Amino acid sequence: MTIAEIRKHAATRMDQSIAAFRNNLQKIRTGRANPALLDAVQVDYYGALVPLSQVANVALIDARTISVQPWEKGMGAKIEKAIRDSDLGLNPAAMGDLIRVPMPPMSQERRKEMTKLARNEGESAKIAVRNLRRDANESIKKLVKDKLASEDEQKRAETEVQKFTDKHIAEIDALVAAKEQEIMAL
């Protein structure tokens, strides 16, 4: 592996870490309804647990209500039970074939818990980015040790990897701040 390949690999992996972090942030509940909130709900489908999105259509009705439309008529009760049993604190209501999931207003205490969760996710993402930096720097040092690169190239490459790291950590901080603001907004 050359230094250029190591840098490219590190940048790609850091981008993937940011994408995974964004995905995790979407699952954190805010005051508004978000269909991604129900992604983690598992439904019993003929003896197997499957994600809700594989047995129903999940959409927004308005800013505070999610609709769940089962693809099979008999699945309504199971979907309703799965949503109620999830640790999201939601209370679905069946209206014929359609299940409405109103988002209850969050208490101040719950909002603080959610911001803490967002910060913890941010810290985990930063740790992942820093670990990728460490791995890249170790690979670069190995090239120098094996005499496949000079020490000047090592310094340049490490500086570039550090710039990638700083950029990605700043992006994580910005995403966490935006999520905190979204959670605390009434």
Curated annotation (Swiss-Prot):
Domain of life: Bacteria
Keyword terms, alphabetized: Cytoplasm, Protein biosynthesis
GO MF terms held by the record: ribosomal large subunit binding
GO cellular component: cytosol
GO biological process, one term: cytoplasmic translational termination
Subcellular location field: Cytoplasm
InterPro entries xrefs: Ribosome_recyc_fac, Ribosome_recyc_fac_dom, RRF_sf
Main location: cytoplasm
PANTHER family: MITOCHONDRIAL RIBOSOME RECYCLING FACTOR PSEUDO 1, RIBOSOME RECYCLING FACTOR
Protein purpose: Responsible for the release of ribosomes from messenger RNA at the termination of protein biosynthesis. May increase the efficiency of translation by recycling ribosomes from one round of translation to another.
Family label: Belongs to the RRF family.
Designated name of the protein: Ribosome-recycling factor
Organism: Verminephrobacter eiseniae (strain EF01-2)
Lineage, opening ranks: Bacteria, Pseudomonadati, Pseudomonadota, Betaproteobacteria, Burkholderiales
Gene that encodes the chain: frr
